Amino acid sequence: MEKLVTQQVQNVDPKQSEILNISEIPAENPTETPIISKQKLLEAGVYFGHKASQWHPKMAQFLLKKKRNETHIIDVLKTQKMLEIAYKLVEKFAQKGAKFIFVGTKKQAKKVIEEQAVRTNSIYVSGRWLGGTLTNNRTILSRLKTMENLEKQAAENFQGYTKKEKLAKQKQLAKLQKNLNGIKGLKDVPLFSLIMLVADPLKDAIAVKEARKKGIKIIGITDSNVDPSLVDFGIPANDDSTKSITLIFTVLADAIASAKGGKKLFAYQSDENIILPEDPEKELKQTRYRNNSFEKFARQKNTLKESQVLKPNTEIQA
């Protein structure tokens, strides 16, 4: 444990090392259980990138040189290493008293964002990001105050109001709760102590931009089409799969829980103890289509051996 993470992962951007003090975090002992096994990462589909035409050149170091059906494949070994570092960063920040805001407004991220934020007593945004959440704090705090007042009135069944007024207030409260429930705790957290964990920096570009403006550190998933410089520390992985996002965000939440003496659900657990959600049918069809396309392409071009064809629960040969 004497080596440093910067010695373990040569591809870490110097900017990331400087901003997040990676050099202070001890590297994993290679004889220990990996944070997540390579097999589990493959099962989660973290290796699926986007079409080569959509890639971002700064992600080149995290991609396999050979493309499949003109689609980039993310190197799962580098995903594993970067996830390990991200875990230790989050754990370290949590130990120092940092607070976290989970952000994931795309369909595939909503459920895990809410579950893991609630589990770790963190702030979250899984619905629409309200412009100014971080940069126009006064307006957001004012809305939170309004919501709190309405909740108090609701507890008393809106006593003193007519039926029509009650319905109007109930409707107003429901709308505020839908947009603000996840950020209730924002009023008690100084922004300088926040760390943002984001599922898709492109989908939630406004949130990322506001965090940047306020000097909030950002850790997020960086798919093959994402500029990794959008975040302070990126985890190269598929950001369009429910399984992939669930795996990564549960591990990050494990880091927060561990710092507080809580239980780890996925991090450093055996494969049989890691149960991933079933992908929605649309996602499943897309995954099967990609796998079939990769297999057909490989056989036509003779670029892969049969054992290297991408199938569920098989390893990728770099």
From Swiss-Prot:
The keyword Ribonucleoprotein applies. Keywords: Ribonucleoprotein, Ribosomal protein. GO terms for biological process: translation. InterPro entries: Ribosomal_uS2, Ribosomal_uS2_bac/mit/plastid, Ribosomal_uS2_flav_dom_sf. Transmembrane segments: none annotated. One of its GO terms (molecular function) is structural constituent of ribosome. The keyword Ribosomal protein applies. GO terms for cellular component: cytosolic small ribosomal subunit. Belongs to the universal ribosomal protein uS2 family. NCBIfam families: rpsB_bact. This is Small ribosomal subunit protein uS2. The lineage of its organism: Bacteria, Bacillati, Mycoplasmatota, Mycoplasmoidales, Metamycoplasmataceae. The gene is rpsB.
